[in-house]
Amino acid sequence: MSDLHNESIFITGGGSGLGLALVERFIEKGAQVATLELSAAKVASLRQRFGEHILAVEGNVTCYADYQRAVDQILTRSGKLDCFIGNAGIWDHNASLVNTPAETLETGFHELFNVNVLGYLLGAKACAPALIASEGSMIFTLSNAAWYPGGGGPLYTASKHAATGLIRQLAYELAPKVRVNGVGPCGMASDLRGPQALGQSETSIMQSLTPEKIAAILPLQFFPQPADFTGPYVMLTSRRNNRALSGVMINADAGLAIRGIRHVAAGLDL
């Protein structure tokens, strides 16, 4: 039996991309999974696909009341909460400082930070009492932009750097009761959208980046799928496999940190 059997897991943005892959993985592990999802259509799809194995709540991660409503339903259903995974986010499609009008930069900043930073903070606030009671964990989705420039524009990159500070502070404030960590995936096949303020709410990340382009820049030379990144979340959630890690950010970048100056990777001819 999996050590995550009957663990109560709450994931935001579980309707597509990495969030959906996490929903699938934790259900496979026998966990009781809940998600807060903005799209009514995706909520309906989750309920149809997973039935009683998913508690899908329609709501906005920028609204504390929506979080609290979801947590109340989770506690009614499961009696506990073991892990909160803050995952819902938006990207800025590499919108640069120079090419973004000042008024758009301001509104885009507030929209993107509301989702990518405030959304995590509100989720942590709503989940903290239940996680303190269960001595559980929080995990936040970062990005390669939390370590490197060029993984987005200044808005997105700043939001992911802010999230690393949030992880460290929450890990400090909630220790020893709650472990708080992050996972930073690189580019992958997903439906990640951009801020409405930048005119990007209907534009998917895959309209800006091709599989070939992503694979070419990665030393491991493959185009990642969302399921490729679920392992670190499973490990960090597990009490058996992770008693010692808190305030840690796992950089799941397919080797970007060891990309060479002369070549992407030295073993391409092996």
Swiss-Prot record:
The keyword Oxidoreductase applies. CDD domains: BphB-like_SDR_c. It catalyses: 3-(cis-5,6-dihydroxycyclohexa-1,3-dien-1-yl)propanoate + NAD(+) = 3-(2,3-dihydroxyphenyl)propanoate + NADH + H(+); (2E)-3-(cis-5,6-dihydroxycyclohexa-1,3-dien-1-yl)prop-2-enoate + NAD(+) = (2E)-3-(2,3-dihydroxyphenyl)prop-2-enoate + NADH + H(+). Pathway: Aromatic compound metabolism; 3-phenylpropanoate degradation. Disulfide bonds: none annotated. It is an enzyme of class 1 (oxidoreductase). It comes from the Bacteria. NAD(+) binds at residues 10-34. Converts 3-phenylpropionate-dihydrodiol (PP-dihydrodiol) and cinnamic acid-dihydrodiol (CI-dihydrodiol) into 3-(2,3-dihydroxylphenyl)propanoic acid (DHPP) and 2,3-dihydroxicinnamic acid (DHCI), respectively. This is 3-phenylpropionate-dihydrodiol/cinnamic acid-dihydrodiol dehydrogenase. The lineage of its organism: Bacteria, Pseudomonadati, Pseudomonadota, Gammaproteobacteria, Enterobacterales. The gene is hcaB.
